[in-house]
Amino acid sequence: MKIHPSAVAITAALIVASVLLAPSRAHACTLYAAAGTAVDDGGVMMSKVRDWRPSEETLVRVTPKPGEGYAYVGLATGKYQNFNMGVNEKGLALGLSTAGSIPKKERLAMPHFRSKDGFTSPAYLLRHCATVEEAIRATEAYVDPVNFILADKTEAAVIEVMPGGKRTVKRIKTGTIAHTNHYIEPESEAFNQKIGKSSEVRLARIKALLADSTSDGKTMTFDAFKALGHDRNAGPDHSIWRTGSQPDGTQTVAYMAVKFPKAGGYPILHLEWRTKADDPASLQVIEEPVTFNR
């Protein structure tokens, strides 16, 4: 994959330092995926829309030393530049959203995952897992109260992590799946203390868009799939793509979509990220095959 000129190559050492210093942050995000009969070529597509207060996002490429894990590319986000979303050299993609239906004070007081070498769960999973199946089996990484979306060339999955580390796992090889910022499975719903209006509205909207896009035998192209993440149907604060009603309020600051072609070959990574915190016009865009020279 060619890295955009504005990208910053962040070494593993710098990422370790950032995660050790960084407190947990809430991420109001929309996650969705499509697979099999929902996709024009029968492959798999996944996406994450990242909403947060105005912040700079950085495109990074991490190539660990031999024996220390897989190479990966994606976005480091916010003040502490934690790795937030991306895809690795084996073809595993992931993103996450906070379980915002649990009060922030309580979330911050809960245990949070750090690997023995200091990595948070997104970076750890991409460094050490090659497939969705392997990522699901890496149970040690699921500690924080968050929701993960995972995808590879054969399937997509959403994992809810509840307080105490219990999980729900929903996997698809065909059809669609979506999540936002509250628990939605029967085993997890009891942990919702207060569901935000935006989370409810965005979840209903992305589910409706996915259903409409795949009804009556229809399938989605990658362009059509990406367009869902840019929907502004519900205004500045409750749309999937949020412009924000306040300059310093929550708004969409980054977007990722990944396509795994049914025929095989390299995954296609689409990224959009804000390079200047207070300037929505600073959005950078790339779309390229993910390749690593190892």
Predicted regions and their residues:
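C-terminus-biased signal that marks the final domain/tail of proteins
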Residues: 27-42, 68, 103, 134-138, ...
